[in-house]
Amino acid sequence: KDGYPVDNANCKYE
């Protein structure tokens, strides 16, 4: 999304 560290399986570098 914004480039924040991937914490969730659906919140990676998208």
UniProtKB/Swiss-Prot annotation:
Expressed by the venom gland. Keywords: Ion channel impairing toxin, Neurotoxin, Secreted, Toxin, Voltage-gated sodium channel impairing toxin. One of its GO terms (cellular component) is extracellular region. InterPro entries: LCN-type_CS_alpha_beta_dom. It comes from the Eukaryota. The keyword Repeat does not apply. Its main location: secreted. One of its GO terms (molecular function) is sodium channel regulator activity. Binds to sodium channels (Nav) and inhibits the inactivation of the activated channels, thereby blocking neuronal transmission. Causes prolonged contractile paralysis in C.partellus larvae. It also has significant toxic effects on B.fusca larvae but not on mice. Has the structural arrangement of an alpha-helix connected to antiparallel beta-sheets by disulfide bonds (CS-alpha/beta). Belongs to the long (4 C-C) scorpion toxin superfamily. Sodium channel inhibitor family. This is Insect toxin PlIT. It comes from Parabuthus liosoma (African black tail scorpion).
